[in-house]
Amino acid sequence: MKNPQKLAITFLPLYVIPTYTLCIKALYKNTHAGLLFSFLGFVLNTPAMSISGPPTTFILYRLHGVRRVLHWTLPDHEQTLYAFTGGSRSMAVKTDARCDTMSGGMIVLQHTHTVTLLTIDCSTDFSSYAFTHRDFHLQDKPHATFAMPFMSWVGSDPTSQLYSNVGGVLSVITEDDLSMCISIVIYGLRVNRPDDQTTPTPTPHQYTSQRRQPETNCPSPQPAFFTSDDDVLSLILRDAANA
């Protein structure tokens, strides 16, 4: 009999991606953040997600007042620049959860056949991601929805830079009410520092940002929260060390 863990990992994207995309789109239309974490708890408790190993990470940006500022394409390259007036960022890693309010800012989405770059820049948050994937043609049209599996990723914020060879799914949903949902699911937390691969992972406080004091007024039923002065990659790195 074949290894059940290998079978679960093989068919995990087929199980998660369609369900995840439909549920996130439905949740995005609902203003109750508690439903989001209920969905995350359901997914994390499924047999496929219960395989021993690093936990799954969920990052969700919910933005409003979104407008397209610039869009241009080349035969093998596409770039879109968005502006938004505000929103929120939700995270769930293992038993921890967090939701921060975001001020207005800009989004840059660059797409090639093998790499997709995502940069979110506002006064309360800056994060940049690069996702490596197989040939995938993005159709960036208004009111579009897409889910793109990736094989590895690189991320940077004002306090840290990480890369990981674990895969996941990037989803972008744009609605006709000037709103957007960007979700990132990472199937594990085995991460490395590009600038130093020989030394042990530093303690989390070395990656703590004192740059911002975000509001944490998004409702959540979870009792545990990340500290308010951590950046996205700092949180991922901290939980990777404890995985």
UniProtKB/Swiss-Prot annotation:
Sorted alphabetically, the keyword list is:
Host nucleus
* Major location (coarse): host cell
Any one Pfam family here would be Herpes_UL4
Record keyword Transcription present: no
Presence of the UniProt keyword Ligase in the record: no
Q: Which GO terms describe its cellular component?
A: host cell nucleus
- Give start-end of the signal peptide: none
List the subcellular locations. Host nucleus
Q: For the region Disordered, give the residue spans.
A: 193-226
**Highest taxon in the source lineage:** Viruses
> InterPro entries per the record?
Herpes_UL4 (IPR004958)
- Ranges of Polar residues composition bias in the record: 205-219
Q: Which family does it belong to?
A: Belongs to the alphaherpesvirinae HHV-1 UL4 family.
**Annotated protein name in UniProt:** Nuclear protein UL4 homolog
Q: What is the lineage of its organism?
A: Viruses, Duplodnaviria, Heunggongvirae, Peploviricota, Herviviricetes
